[in-house]
Amino acid sequence: YTNADLIYACHVLEHFPTKPFPFQPLTWKEVLTSWHKALRPGGVLRLSVPDIKAACEHYLLTDDFDSVQAFFYGGQKYDFDYHYHGWSYETLEKELMSMGFCDVRVYDWKSTEHFYVDDYSQAYLPHMDKTNGKLMSLNVEATKK
């Protein structure tokens, strides 16, 4: 149970509440704790979550709320497709450090072994403009002490 080298979770953490609900009993802190337990010492947790600061900046710059709405509230295309929490680098780093992670850092999705997988770690605005757009995902790695 404690031997994983890497856990990768792309746009998962924001779907867990701060406090448990009957229909969503796990909190994001419990999820992070579970992932921490599953990693071996020196193992890496690689997260991608909506970058709340980037979404706010894009909205303030463009006044186009429709383009950033899903980053705040989730896509809402099906049950449970909504967000309970938003993250900045500073808030995520603080939580990861308090849970026993170290060396918290932003990673470049282009440098990962899964760069060819078109997932939300590559979410840009304007939509999928990876050359001129702004990355809307906060991509963070942390190492288990």
Region locations from a protein language model:
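S-adenosyl-L-methionine-dependent methyltransferase catalytic module, highlighting the catalytic core
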Residues: 17-143
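Short catalytic micro-motifs in class I SAM-dependent methyltransferases
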Residues: 8-15, 20
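A short acidic, Gly/Pro-enriched loop at the edge of an enzyme's catalytic core
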Residues: 1-8
